[in-house]
Design a protein with these regions (language model features):
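Short, Lys/Arg-rich flexible segments
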Residues: 1-155
């Protein structure tokens, strides 16, 4: 004995799409990423769980003023969900790299002792705060699946 059910694929897809608010889904994505990225500033760990390299001054890494962490904001428009920052120094801290002077012969900044230091270059260690990992992806998938099922049930 066989039981066969035929769905008109177009009708089912149309029903789901009609009831599905993609803005809700991208809101979930951006919210979960935002929480995870900001948590990394407190745990001082990268997406793989590795500790960030300590800084020379001690204290909380990348949190002296809180400007970088507080600049991270959600992006969600129904097509894309994520986070961004407008701080130009975010990339060098996230990816690491070498900073060299552009206009002068030396870089000038305050050292650990508060006195000015002049150097040819500064190596910034990678302290990744942006990035996905399996745990975050799984959490997002679970929340999106739940939201889709709620929308289907309520239709």
């Amino acid at each position: 004995m066989q039981i066969k059910t035929k769905f008109k694929r177009n009708n089912l897809v149309e029903i789901i799409a009609e009831k599905l608010n993609t803005k809700e889904l991208t809101d979930i994505i951006s919210s979960e990423i935002d929480k995870e990225v900001k948590l990394r500033f407190y745990t001082q760990k990268d997406p793989k769980g590795n500790k960030w390299q300590p800084n020379g001054r001690g204290g909380k890494i990348l949190r002296d003023t809180g400007q970088l962490m507080n600049s991270i904001h959600r992006i969600s428009d129904g097509k894309v969900g994520g986070v961004a920052t407008n701080k130009i120094y975010a990339r060098i801290h996230n990816e690491g790299g070498i900073i060299r002077p552009k206009e002068k012969s030396k870089l000038k900044f305050k050292g650990v002792d508060g006195k000015f230091v002049f150097v040819d270059e500064v190596e910034i260690p990678k302290r990744q705060f942006f990035g996905m990992n399996k745990k975050l992806k799984d959490r997002i998938k679970k929340k999106i699946s739940k939201k889709i099922l709620e929308n289907i049930k309520n239709s």
